């Protein structure tokens, strides 16, 4: 029977918007999607959401490296991420971004409530500062020699050689990763979230029994070592949300990132025109269930900071955190040089999504264990389980039903007791899906598949088909096989969405959890078409080789306006205000005798004439074409004596040089002498 319908909100950790989705990411999104699809099959109201984590120094700097704006970069990355997840049939109801108006408003609301409730503290701290880039440096943007083992080229927070942790100020000969400059110490006022105030609440939440044992044990270690106030602010320049009433101060990315769960759900509610559900799911006394699927590397933020922030701002806490381990490939950490650091899009160029969904699912449990993607075992397991056991069960029976009985199944079950064995397994398999013991569910299903194939082997329909007068037996045997295939595919529906679609088309019926209680009797199926193809190691070899080639391509130097000509050191507004930019009319333009680079421009500033030499001859070989145009000039630049005369200012142009120089022009309506403000 269908259970009492629950309201469930499910999230995956937000992928960072500075890189592509890879197979490590896909473990979590597949795990969550399988669980969500099962919940939907059982009749629950599930909202499944995600978003890109789109703020922080790494995004700001990478955008500069690529020569584009952060907004452009995260927009392009969001499209790529959504394409990858759609390719793996991750059934999100909404995919959003933390760089959104919903997230800004919610971040400001939560911060304001925390501040009003006395949980935000201010104090001055000393940090390493890059004097060339004019920015404070996060720990991972400082490198130097480890103070413990003296290994060179180590990050500012921990040594990858000896494992020591330390402050970036302890590094020997520290250097900025951004500019290579030697950082200096500078003071800055920062805002801190008073996490220790929530220690008692968090310990009670830990002891509630809802969290995984491994998570609860780790949290206990943190409680014993003492909780510390959490720095939630960063100084400009920073790509993120500015803190209310604190010019030049921005929310640290890890403050607004989890709020992105709320922002994405708010966006979904607004799209639906639903003004009720947001509060229904997030209010303090909500009876809806909230689950976060996350990796073990971000447990600290989700088990301490996030529930404390919610508690302190009068929102509900998560029902539970579902934490998983990492992905290794062929028994080792994913490697770019070995071609085992595989992007999601690269995988889909060589294999279908269902194959990886099945392999990951078969290995997952409710524990925080790492999952190894052994590529040879992957090929063998997909072929043995999906092709040989499940799909083959349909193909070896469908031919007889289609050819001999016009696709119509028998009106009675050949073996009702065997069918009951299959349907009785729904409770055990359902509980395994519910409790995220996915590997157990797959083992139970494959044991049934073995039983089904044994039945067909023993009944030998290919022999019966040759015996006169046994048409009814043949129809009954093959109908039984197809009904067992239907039950198996129903149990596998959360895992194999594309194969399920093809199976439903063949069976001519939708696969539902409760529907298997009634077998298909006297039912007409459609002509059988191949449901799934075998895979082989040649595809694996091509996949690995393609991943290696992508690494080579990614290592190629980045070019672009900002990459080739980086933004100069930050200036103050007072410095900028000294530059007087004016609209000027080009009254005359001519070549300069003796120069192959310069044009002589006569400019009208609306009552004052200027003579300006400009190095734009390569871009404007016909100077007469410039006469009558409006442009922008620096009007208060000191006159410069040149071999050809005195230049009384500078016209503004963009471009790398040579023929690629583009004179700037104001919009129509601007008049000579107008100041540019």
From Swiss-Prot:
Its main location: cytoplasm. Keywords: Aminoacyl-tRNA synthetase, ATP-binding, Cytoplasm, Ligase, Metal-binding, Nucleotide-binding, Protein biosynthesis, RNA-binding, tRNA-binding, Zinc. Binds 1 zinc ion per subunit. A motif ('HIGH' region) lies at residues 15-25. It holds the Pfam family tRNA-synt_1g. It comes from the Bacteria. A motif ('KMSKS' region) lies at residues 333-337. Its EC number is 6.1.1.10. GO terms for cellular component: cytosol. InterPro entries: aa-tRNA-synth_I_CS (IPR001412), Anticodon_Met (IPR041872), Met-tRNA-synth_bsu_C (IPR004495), Met-tRNA_ligase_1 (IPR023458), Met-tRNA_synth (IPR014758), Methionyl/Leucyl_tRNA_Synth (IPR015413), MetRS_core (IPR033911), MetRS_Zn (IPR029038). PANTHER family: METHIONINE--TRNA LIGASE, METHIONINE--TRNA LIGASE, CYTOPLASMIC. NCBIfam families: metG, metG_C_term, PRK00133.1. This is Methionine--tRNA ligase. It comes from Escherichia coli O157:H7. The gene is metG.
């Amino acid at each position: 029977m269908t259970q009492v319908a629950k309201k469930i909100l499910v999230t995956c950790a937000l992928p960072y918007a500075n890189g592509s989705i890879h197979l490590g990411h896909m473990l979590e999104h597949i795990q969550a999607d399988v669980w969500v699809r099962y919940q939907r099959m059982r009749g629950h109201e599930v909202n499944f959401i995600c978003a890109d984590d789109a703020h922080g120094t790494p995004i700001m700097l990478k955008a500069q490296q690529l020569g584009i704006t952060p907004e452009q970069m995260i927009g392009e990355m969001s499209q790529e991420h959504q394409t990858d997840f759609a390719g793996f049939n991750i059934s999100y109801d909404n995919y959003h971004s933390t760089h959104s108006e919903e997230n800004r408003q919610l971040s400001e609301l939560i911060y304001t409530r925390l501040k009003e409730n006395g949980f935000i503290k201010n104090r001055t701290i000393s940090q390493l500062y890059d004097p060339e880039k004019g920015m404070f440096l996060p720990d991972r943007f400082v490198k130097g020699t480890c103070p413990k083992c003296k290994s060179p080229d180590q990050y500012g927070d921990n040594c990858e050689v000896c494992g020591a942790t330390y402050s970036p100020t302890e590094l020997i000969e520290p250097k900025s990763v951004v500019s290579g400059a030697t950082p200096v110490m500078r003071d800055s006022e920062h805002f801190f979230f008073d996490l220790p105030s929530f220690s008692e609440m968090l310990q009670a939440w830990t002891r509630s029994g809802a969290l995984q044992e491994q998570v609860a044990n780790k949290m206990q270690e943190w409680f014993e070592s003492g909780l510390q106030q959490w720095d939630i602010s960063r100084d400009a320049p920073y790509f993120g949300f500015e803190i209310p009433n604190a010019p030049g101060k921005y929310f640290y990315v890890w403050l607004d990132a989890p709020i992105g769960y709320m922002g994405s759900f708010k966006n979904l509610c607004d799209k639906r025109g639903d003004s009720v559900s947001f509060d229904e799911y997030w209010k303090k006394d909500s009876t809806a269930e909230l689950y976060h699927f996350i990796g073990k590397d971000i447990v600290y933020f989700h088990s301490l900071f996030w529930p404390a922030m919610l508690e302190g701002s009068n929102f509900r806490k998560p029902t539970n955190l579902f934490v998983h381990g990492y992905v290794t490939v062929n028994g080792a950490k994913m490697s770019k040089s070995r071609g085992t650091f595989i992007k999601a899009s690269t995988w889909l160029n060589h294999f279908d999504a269902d194959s990886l969904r099945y392999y990951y699912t078969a290995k997952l449990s409710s524990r925080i264990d790492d999952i190894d993607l052994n590529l040879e075992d992957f090929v063998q397991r997909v072929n043995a389980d999906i092709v040989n056991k499940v799909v083959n069960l349909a193909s070896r029976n469908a031919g007889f039903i289609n050819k001999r009985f016009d696709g119509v199944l028998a009106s009675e079950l050949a073996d009702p007791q065997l069918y009951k064995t299959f349907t009785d397994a729904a409770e055990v398999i359902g509980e395994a899906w519910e409790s995220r013991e996915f590997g157990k569910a797959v083992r139970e299903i494959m044991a049934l598949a073995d039983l089904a194939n044994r039945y067909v082997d023993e009944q030998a329909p290919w022999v019966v088909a040759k015996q006169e007068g046994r048409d009814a037996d043949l129809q009954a045997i093959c109908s039984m096989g197809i009904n067992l295939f239907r039950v198996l595919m129903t149990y596998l529906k959360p895992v194999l969405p594309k194969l399920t679609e093809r199976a439903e088309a063949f069976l001519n019926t939708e696969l539902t959890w409760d529907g298997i209680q009634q077998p298909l009797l006297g039912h007409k199926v459609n002509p059988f078409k191949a449901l799934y193809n075998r895979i082989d190691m040649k595809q694996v070899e091509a996949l690995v080789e393609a991943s290696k080639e992508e690494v080579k391509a990614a290592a190629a130097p980045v070019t672009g306006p900002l990459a080739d000509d980086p933004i100069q050191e930050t200036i103050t507004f007072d410095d900028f205000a000294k530059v007087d930019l004016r609209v000027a009319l080009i009254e005359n333009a001519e070549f300069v005798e003796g120069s192959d680079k310069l044009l002589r421009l006569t400019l009208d500033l609306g009552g004052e004439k200027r003579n300006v030499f400009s190095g734009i001859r390569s871009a404007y070989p016909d100077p007469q074409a410039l006469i009558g145009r409006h442009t922008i000039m620096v009007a208060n630049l000191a006159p410069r004596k040149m071999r050809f005369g005195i230049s009384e200012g500078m016209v503004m142009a963009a471009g790398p040089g040579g023929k690629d120089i583009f004179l700037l022009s104001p919009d129509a309506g601007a008049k000579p002498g107008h100041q540019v403000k």
